[in-house]
């Protein structure tokens, strides 16, 4: 669970909503630090070429209440699950935070 600005966000609920988009193959949602909210939802998505973050966010506006929509979206080319089909969420979270620091 991600606590963002006092609101509870359940990653599985957000992931399921993202995966309903016709161009999305897979999604993982992790919590990343946020100066204002404590944490915020960050989506890692495998999608068809040409899919934009805005396209995903517009789609989610009809699927989720506003506070559950990820504040950031990152498209990933590599598989989001390991060979056993498991998501290594803590490792993905740390990798995402590191990429954000490097891009800041």
Give, region by region, the residue ranges found by the protein language model.
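Short clusters of hydrophobic/aromatic residues that line enzyme substrate/ligand-binding pockets
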Residues: 2, 80, 87, 92
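AMP-binding/adenylate-forming catalytic core of the ANL superfamily
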Residues: 1-68, 94
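AMP-binding/adenylate-forming catalytic domain of the ANL superfamily
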Residues: 65-86
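Intrinsically disordered, low-complexity regions of eukaryotic proteins
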Residues: 17, 36, 76, 84-85, ...
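Short amphipathic alpha-helical leader/targeting segments
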Residues: 20, 53, 74, 99-100
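AMP-dependent adenylate-forming
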Residues: 54, 89-104
